[in-house]
Amino acid sequence: MVSPIGTKASEEQCYMGTYHSTRGRTLSCSSKVAIRTGIAPDGGLFVSDELGTQQLDISSLADKSYFEIAQDVLGMLLNDYTAEEISACVDEAYRGTFASKEVTPLVKLDAAPGADAPQTYVMELFGGPTSAFKDVALQMLPRLMARTSAKDGGAERIMIVTATSGDTGKAALAGFADAPGTGITVFYPEGKVSRVQNLQMSTQEGDNVAVCGIRGNFDDAQSAVKRIFADKELAERLEAAGTVLSSANSNNVGRLVPQVVYYFAAYAQLLRTGAIEAGDAVEFCVPTGNFGDILAGYYAKRMGLPVAKLVVASDKNNVLADFLTTGVYDRNRPFFTTISPSMDILISSNLERMLYFLSDGDCELVAGLMEQLAQTGRYEVPAELLAKIQSVFGCGWASEDEVRTAIKSCWDANGYVIDPHTACGYHVFEQVAPAEGAKARVLLSTASPYKFPRACCDALGLDVPEDDFEAMRMLEQATNTVAPTQLAELESKPVRFEDVCDVNEMASYVESAAKRMSTN
């Protein structure tokens, strides 16, 4: 569990249940405990060996709404929540909060990227309140946490501590703002997120929120957050004050499982339009840095979704593409700040869950690899494991120039604007041969182009204004599209948070925030 790590209280919350650590099976727990507490006592991530023992009926998907599919998927993965609890969470998270009744609608591209490619669709995951795919999970996670209680985690108040490369922070803040019994502290790399992303966080309203930039990159922030979770003395002080730490990153299984839903929802939409027949395989391409979004696709595959291939799309920080090609994971390399900042990551936390499942649950192997990563910054998987990984996952990456070219190519061919992260996936689909047997391709679009208006204007050959909001207006004019209201309004919102700290000051910042929020 995230906190109090290693204390007597934390171990008392773990009992024989569905979820256990990727690094050992000594303790197991319910999904409510896993969600409330975030990370296992040994630093591993919570997994369930029951994944895949229940399969969704693919033939019935076409007749189901997003809400019904979500209830089915979450009910299978979170089996200690009642059907009534799941139904309420789904309704609260998605009814009226997303722009489309489909929640994550598909858009058919006129021209499929790549040679000999089947019909290709973009799945728009950015219709939520912060215009990024993280909303799908982070509108759900607070509702799931609200259905837990102190007996599931050892304290009355939950303090969410999250590192963000840009999108998770705002989505988490929006989800947890003024949620009863919670507080949230978000750390982001100062100067390494877009201005729009920065303003989304720094203008956040709510009495239980705190936002702080750190001097460093996302990996520095994420590693420091993990150290905060492992700090026994801090955990004991917070617990004595009635607070337990938890995570809103995709390390938390409650962040991961809602993302499984939209893979099935995409398949349902393809069935309804007649693009495929039940049982046909679909290839998905996923821009990803922390491996959570694409891991959700693997969960869907284990649960019966006909997946031809899951293709990882990286930016210039291509540690994942290198790993999937060679079997060597090596973060000892230059870190690049790119125009796709949410993917500027060299330590992909959710890869640990994938290693667990594809090694057939070899906790000892996973623990050893994670220890090597912590000590040396690298590890290499056995050849037979790499072969299994490559049978499920494909990969590719895009340079900065290739990202810009992809944005322009997609616009020229389809009259459709994509953001720089989605453009990484578009480029990879152009370069990678279609998976054998794939009847359709789906590119996951992770953010609105209006979160990165200057990069999009530049790629489209427009004169790029220095100001992001001028760039939004220019992009609207040039493409005859409309910026999401919640982004356009940021220009006039007052900034509430301007804090910046060193990495070694983050724990103190969390403790101060927890004390301040406990008096609210």
What are these regions (language model features)?
Residues 2-520:
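PLP-dependent amino-acid enzyme catalytic core
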